[in-house]
Amino acid sequence: DWGFLEKLLDQVQEHSTVVGKIWLTVLFIFRILILGLAGESVWGDEQSDFECNTAQPGCTNVCYDQAFPISHIPYWVLQFLFVSTPTLVYLGHVIYLSRREERLRQKEGELRALPDKDPRVERALAGIERQMAKISVA
């Protein structure tokens, strides 16, 4: 659903400073671009170029596995996860803030809909406004 992604990016823009917006975008794109460009040449098919010193069938696979016991693909996936983790953590924080803000707005609407102006309701509304001020960047 593209609507979720659009809402998430709008929230990121709302909760970021100008420097943060540029930093997040450039750094994430740069990291993924470098990883994608370097990934093929660094973690490409090395086994086809590997030569075995005997003509025995299956020797190339056994020799390659002996020389390189761990596949390069898990390293590439691990690096991709490490590269994207800071951005994903920030996006998770933005999702948390937007949901918290949504709950506070809903609670505020429910309290404002009450017919009586009870002092407890006024205090609760003031508390919600303070919490909303903490969430807002502006």
Swiss-Prot record:
Q: Name one GO biological process term.
A: cell communication
Q: Where is the signal peptide?
A: none
**Record membrane topology:** Multi-pass membrane protein
According to the UniProt topology, which residue ranges lie Extracellular? 40-74
Q: Which InterPro entries match?
A: Connexin, Connexin_CS, Connexin_N, Connexin_N_sf
The domain of life is Eukaryota
**Keyword tags:** Cell junction, Cell membrane, Gap junction, Membrane, Transmembrane, Transmembrane helix
Q: What is its main location?
A: membrane
Statement: the UniProt record of this protein carries the keyword Transmembrane: yes
Q: Which residues cross the membrane?
A: 17-39, 75-97
Q: Which GO CC annotations does the UniProt entry carry?
A: connexin complex
Q: Which Pfam families match?
A: Connexin
What subcellular locations does the record give? Cell membrane; Cell junction, Gap junction
- Per the record, what ranges lie on the membrane's Cytoplasmic side? 1-16, 98-138
Q: What does this protein do?
A: One gap junction consists of a cluster of closely packed pairs of transmembrane channels, the connexons, through which materials of low MW diffuse from one cell to a neighboring cell.
Q: How does it assemble?
A: A connexon is composed of a hexamer of connexins.
Tell me which family the UniProt entry assigns to this protein: Belongs to the connexin family. Alpha-type (group II) subfamily.
Q: What protein name does the entry list?
A: Gap junction alpha-4 protein
**Organism field:** Sus scrofa
Its encoding gene is what? GJA4
